[in-house]
């Protein structure tokens, strides 16, 4: 399995999008970041809950979130409740300096501990040449350095391999899936350590739609007047509100 980020969107709107592929290249998940952060809102639209799901891959159940979605505990819990085994995280990198890398590390290690899953996190990296092309202002250039924390975290919250904090590269590691059971035996946030009768999550995972198409009226709906109905039919219609609907249809037709 593998994940990547991109910008995608049909019909004019763009969305910050994550793609999850299986080992054979099959696209298993296309999800949109549910809330663009700060200045991102000038470019990207809001995603829906349809992408808040874990999918089965050749290497295990995989879920994904982007950047500050990890600061939304309900979004993280939605994936935890679906028993994700590998969590794909992505942050921009080359931003704000070392403090951003520290924040990323805290965030992904905490999610690994809380969910009892592996976290595979990737961050971007800008070269000096790329930074110079982005801005001629030296002060702005400083804001485009550091902030890189590409890492693989175990369910126990530790680095499986040393993190990549500068430059381009790829981290490769063997994942001992038995560590998931070991962690959840002690603390399972969506199992024996959960209290659903006290605290629970309500997720609307329907794809967003800007139009709902109503079912058409039957061909003979409203063709008969109330006077043609017998007393029993009129009483039944009044009881269930159907008479009001017929009057509304007839008035609309008269116009």
Q: For each of these PLM feature ranges, what is it?
A:
Residues 1, 61, 67-171:
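CN hydrolase (nitrilase-like) catalytic-core segments centered on the catalytic cysteine
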Residues 123-255:
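C-terminal beta-strand edge segments of enzyme domains
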Residues 1-8, 226-229:
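Short, compositionally biased segments
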Residues 7-89, 94-110, 149, 186:
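Active-site catalytic loop in hydrolytic enzyme cores
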């Amino acid at each position: 399995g593998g994940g990547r980020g991109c910008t995608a969107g049909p019909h004019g709107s763009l969305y910050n999008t994550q793609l999850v592929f299986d080992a054979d290249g099959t696209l298993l998940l296309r999800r949109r970041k549910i809330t663009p952060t700060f200045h991102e809102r000038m470019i990207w639209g809001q995603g829906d809950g349809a992408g808040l799901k874990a999918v089965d891959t050749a290497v295990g159940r995989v879920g994904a979130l982007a950047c500050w979605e990890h600061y939304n505990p309900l979004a993280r819990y939605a994936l935890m409740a679906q028993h994700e085994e590998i969590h794909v995280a992505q942050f921009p990198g080359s931003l704000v300096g070392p403090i951003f890398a520290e924040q990323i590390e805290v965030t992904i290690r905490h999610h690994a501990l809380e969910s009892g899953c592996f976290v595979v996190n990737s961050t971007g990296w800008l070269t000096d040449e790329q930074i110079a092309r982005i801005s001629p202002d030296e002060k702005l250039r400083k804001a485009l350095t550091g902030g890189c924390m590409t890492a693989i975290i175990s369910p126990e919250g530790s680095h499986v391999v040393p993190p990549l904090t500068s430059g381009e590269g790829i981290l490769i590691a063997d994942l001992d899936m038995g560590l998931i059971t070991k962690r959840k035996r002690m603390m399972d946030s969506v199992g024996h350590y959960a209290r659903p009768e006290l605290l629970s999550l309500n997720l609307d995972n329907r794809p967003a739609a800007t139009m709902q198409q109503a079912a058409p009226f039957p061909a003979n709906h409203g063709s008969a007047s109330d006077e043609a109905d017998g007393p029993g039919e009129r009483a039944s219609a009044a009881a269930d509100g159907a008479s009001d609907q017929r009057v509304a249809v007839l008035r609309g037709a008269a116009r």
